[in-house]
A protein has these predicted regions:
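Metallo-beta-lactamase
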Residues: 2-17, 39, 46-47, 83-138, 141-232, ...
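Short N-terminal helix/helix-N-cap motif within the alpha/beta-hydrolase-1
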Residues: 24, 49-50, 75-77, 142, ...
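Short alpha-helical
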Residues: 28, 49-50, 72-73, 132, ...
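Conserved beta-strand hairpin/beta-sheet module of binuclear metal-dependent hydrolase folds
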Residues: 7-57, 147-163
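C-terminal regulatory/interaction regions
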Residues: 235-254
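Active-site HxH/HxHxD metal-binding segment of metal-dependent hydrolases
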Residues: 46-126, 220-239
Length: 254
């Protein structure tokens, strides 16, 4: 029998015409979005298989990469793309201290791709009226972004809002108040988009975690019979903001 390696396998789901979700072994999700002139992959996952070959099988268009935040499970193998969209502050950090981003690139990476700075309101034109608009939502990282896709009535949130059972803030204990405050401010800033995107498909960076993170429940997810389901949606933004306020006011314990 042929040997199989889960790390090299992908699960591909057609979300809607022109949008595919690609899940890796690490429960990370990335999204291929097509326009008429080019396609954009939002994040990369951590899979070790032939990602560029998979993309070529899904679309005939040239594919660029848009990154929600510079963690390894969202921009691994970014050097395989000719152009990478990344928040302007993250590009500055990468150029100042590249060793801090070593896990985001392959061990054999020899040179960085073209890095295109983005920020609040930036627009990535894919052709045919398909545009990815950038909305900043700090918290998970200082400069996390969400990509809003009006043409497909979808938004790609990475880890900015959370994934089902968790919103992960990475900080030292003495930085907790500052980090939670930044997340609350980011959520408050993002609220202005809610009337526009409330009924869109909210597509997060770890779709399987919307069914819980217990590995015993993962087979339920893949077989389509989950007993737990907490999808990302507009209400989660409001819930997270309320939780931040409760933490900062010590109405809930840290």
């Amino acid at each position: 029998m042929l040997a199989q390696d889960r790390k090299r396998q992908w699960q591909v789901t057609l979300v809607k015409p022109g949008v595919w979700r690609i899940d890796d072994y690490f429960t990370a999700s990335c999204y291929l979005v097509e326009g008429t002139e080019k396609a954009v992959l939002v994040d990369t996952g951590m899979g070790e298989g032939d990602l560029t070959g998979l993309l070529a099988a899904l679309t005939r268009l040239p594919v660029e990469l848009a990154v929600t935040h510079p963690h390894g499970d969202h921009m691994y193998h970014a050097e395989r793309f000719s152009r990478v969209y990344l928040h302007e502050n993250d590009i500055a950090r990468l150029q100042e201290a590249p060793q801090q981003f070593r896990n985001a690139f392959s061990a054999d990476c020899q040179s960085l791709p073209e890095l295109c700075p983005i920020g609040e309101g930036s627009r990535i034109e894919l052709g045919g009226g398909v545009v990815l608009e950038v909305a900043e939502l700090s918290g998970h990282t200082p400069d996390s972004v969400v990509f809003i896709d009006d043409a497909h009535r979808a938004l790609y949130t990475g880890d900015a809002v959370g994934s089902g059972y968790i919103a992960l803030m990475i900080c030292r204990e003495e930085e907790l108040e500052q980090t939670v405050s930044a997340y609350r401010e980011g959520l408050e800033k993002f609220k202005k988009h809610l009337p526009r995107v409330r009924d869109y498909a909210w597509l997060g960076g770890h779709a399987v975690q919307e069914n819980g993170c217990d590995e015993r429940h993962q087979p339920d997810h893949f077989s389509g019979c989950s007993h737990y389901f907490n999808p990302i949606r507009a209400e989660v933004v409001l819930d997270m903001k309320a939780l931040c306020e409760d933490i900062l006011s010590e109405r809930v314990t840290r």
